[in-house]
Amino acid sequence: MDQFIKQDETGDLIETGMNVANHFLSAPIQGTNSLSKATIIPGVAPVLIGNPEQKNIQYPTTSHQGSKSKGRGSGARPIIVSSSEGGTGGTQVPEPLFAQTGQGGIVTTVYQDPTIQPTGSYRSVELAKIGKERMINRFVEKPRTSTPVTEFKRGGPGAAAQGQTIQEEGIDGNGASAGSKERSGSLSGATPYAHLSLPQQDSTPANVGIAPQSAISANEIMDLLRGMDARLQHLEQKVDKVLAQGSMVTQIKNELSTVKTTLATIEGMMATVKIMDPGNPTGVPVDELRRSFSDHVTIVSGPGDVSFSSGEEPTLYLDELARPVPKPRPAKQPKPQPVKDLAGRKVMITKMITDCVANPQMKQVFEQRLAKASTEDALNDIKRDIIRSAI
């Protein structure tokens, strides 16, 4: 079934209903006996009996509605009924079709033109027309001129909760709101992060951006400041340690300069020694230099002083290779080896025979060998045999 009703069908239904209402409203009222007390709308009975009301009648329901009606009293718009009939003006005629509005118990009144005195039949027809127009206006929704303004609350609900707006019916007017107490939804005390909201089709579009991130709370800021203070103190301690090492670095530099000076002095002294003693020529082995310093025959030819050889024997001898050489030098006699004191060694070996040799026969043999030994090698052989026998 189609849920949408066309505007033409709606107009036909309203027209049929208004024709029925005009038929019953056009009939003259015979008296108060034709209406019971339960069927009369409050505020309309004096009009029906010929005593119109002079003031607006209000029926406050609760204290809350009464407070609202004070601030919204300007929302009840009177209706001016024009007529060609003459009479006494200034009479207020209440609207019987819409006597109660449902907001604060306000009775809507109809003000007549001051120069016109309405009659029963004319009043019924005019009120029926006005009721028809109001009923049509109720079925046809007018476009909104502005979006509903919601009260801004710091730390209110999130974006999902903000999207659900409760619209209350009321009169056209502004009133003071007592507000509501709710727990803050944000610990930082700022507006929570909200996504980009799409413009509504039935309202005036406006450029809306993304709300900024939530502000950092005071506790978080203090924690950050304390952390930065601790890091700064730690950094200051490190800087103090670095400055304390500065004196040591200066001392190391001075010692390094002293070492460089000493090294330069040593290099200068070595250069001086090289100048005084150039050393071996490059590429000449030491053996060849030593052979050049050995004795060899020197032949002197021509006139000269021969006194250096006059005292020597002028005889030449031939060596094993038949080479003429002067008198051969006598062979070197080997130096006699100094006689070592063997008495101490013999005492030591005698003690070893007594302690290490258990066999009496072996002891006797070692003692005889020790008595005959006269050299160091013989004593070493005896000592070696004693150690082997003991093992």
UniProtKB/Swiss-Prot annotation:
It comes from the Viruses. Keywords: Coiled coil, Phosphoprotein, Viral RNA replication. The modification Phosphothreonine is found at T10, T16, T39, T91, T150, T165, T250, T258, T282, T298, T375. Residues 343-391 are annotated as: Interaction with the nucleoprotein. Residues 216-279 are annotated as: Multimerization. Residues 55-90, 145-208 are annotated as: Disordered. Residues 55-65 have a biased composition (Polar residues). Residues 218-245 form a coiled coil. The modification Phosphoserine is found at S69, S188, S257, S292, S294, S301, S374. Homotetramer. Interacts (via multimerization domain) with polymerase L; this interaction forms the polymerase L-P complex. Interacts (via N-terminus) with N0 (via Ncore); this interaction allows P to chaperon N0 to avoid N polymerization before encapsidation. Interacts (via C-terminus) with N-RNA template; this interaction positions the polymerase on the template for both transcription and replication. Interacts with host RPS6KB1 kinase; this interaction may play a role in the viral replication and transcription. Essential cofactor of the RNA polymerase L that plays a central role in the transcription and replication by forming the polymerase complex with RNA polymerase L and recruiting L to the genomic N-RNA template for RNA synthesis. Also plays a central role in the encapsidation of nascent RNA chains by forming the encapsidation complex with the nucleocapsid protein N (N-P complex). Acts as a chaperone for newly synthesized free N protein, so-called N0, allowing encapsidation of nascent RNA chains during replication. The N-terminus consists of a long intrinsically disordered tail. The central part contains the coiled-coil multimerization domain (MD or OD). Forms a four-stranded coiled coil structure. The C-terminus constitutes the alpha-helical X domain (XD) that binds to the nucleocapsid (N-RNA complex) and the L polymerase. Belongs to the rubulavirus/avulavirus P protein family. This is Phosphoprotein. It comes from Mumps virus genotype B (strain Miyahara vaccine). The gene is P/V/I.
